[in-house]
Amino acid sequence: MKAKKKTICLMLVTALIVTMCALPVLASGTPINVYVNGQPAPTTNLLINDVTYMPARYLLELLGVQVEYKDGSVYINQANQVKGPVKISTLTENSNENHPDLINEFGLSMFIDTLDCNVLFDTGKLGNIPENAKKLGIDLKKTDCVVLSHAHYDHCGGVKTVVENVKPDDYTLYVGKSFFDNLQKYHYSPGGGPKLDFTDGHKGYTYIGTNFDKAYLDEHKVKIKYVDCDEVKLSKQISLFGNFKPGAVEKMNPAMQLKVGDKYIQDEFTEEIALTVDTNKGLIIVTGCSHTGILNIVETIKERTHKPIYAVLGGTHLIEADAARIQHTIDAFNEMDIEKIGLSHCTGTLAIDTIATQIPDKVFYNSTGTVIKVK
């Protein structure tokens, strides 16, 4: 019944768009773009003598449709489209403070459960996710898609465990288009630096890439698909986003290096991808490390989808940020009116404490065992 109502509503909206020229409330000498539910809509029927005519927005809104005019384009979204329930479980993260029965590690992995698609987003560092998943009541064999946000060991370390031990019934691995070109990842320390998970601070280069390559995946007959465009849809509710351009404020960490031949160059993380879940409250954005900038990722997705952001979950890499950048991030989150911010992994103590102090009603620590549900 719900599907029938949704179809009828979409038909009404489409019919109204096709007959727009009968109600020329807004006319533009320059043809404009029309988007329905984030997708481009044909406007050939709306052109009269090279003038684009738009309908009375009020008639659309009576049908439960949101209409937004912006930058020479019209965005039409069916406000009454009901999405299915969503459950996001953090299988592993740096801390297990709230769930001491689960295994924590320096890494990140989340499981996204929707009606028509189950996604394992990143796999942590050590391959402990099957044990944690079992305790959380999650059957990893029901995984439809495995998504790797980028090619670092603390997000891809559990891949072999998934491939060789979990062996999901039928799944596809999704990675950024340059993932396998960017496997030779290193961290450079000038010496005397802080002790980190992967280094004691000694001078030199430390390998921080994956423990597998494409040949390994091919040997185990893993199906691979690449995120080689701005957006790839996994299901009606879940999408992957890539092609994040370098931001003006959030600079790349010069310590993150890529080995090409016998040379080291700045790692631009061109393979980095993020995931979104479309819910009844707005988009949930799931990130791995946000090496390309957490605001850059969130703002890019908002610009591409023209949908409200309900929540942001995952790593933000604000661990490297100074007070000014952290404050800039807080201001931007407030401006976008994001309701929930689940900080994880590489966010850093200073950023977590600062953000939690300023917007305590929105922020929580998304640690091992945290479960988010949206009906």
How would you label these PLM feature ranges?
Residues 128-180, 302-311, 334:
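Active-site metal-binding motif and surrounding structural segment of the metallo-beta-lactamase
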Residues 252-255, 260-309, 316-317:
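Active-site-proximal loop/helix segments of hydrolase catalytic cores
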Residues 339-340, 347-375:
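C-terminal regulatory/interaction regions
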Residues 120-123, 143-151, 174-177, 285-289, ...:
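Active-site neighborhood of phospho(di)ester-bond hydrolases with catalytic His/Asp-centered motifs
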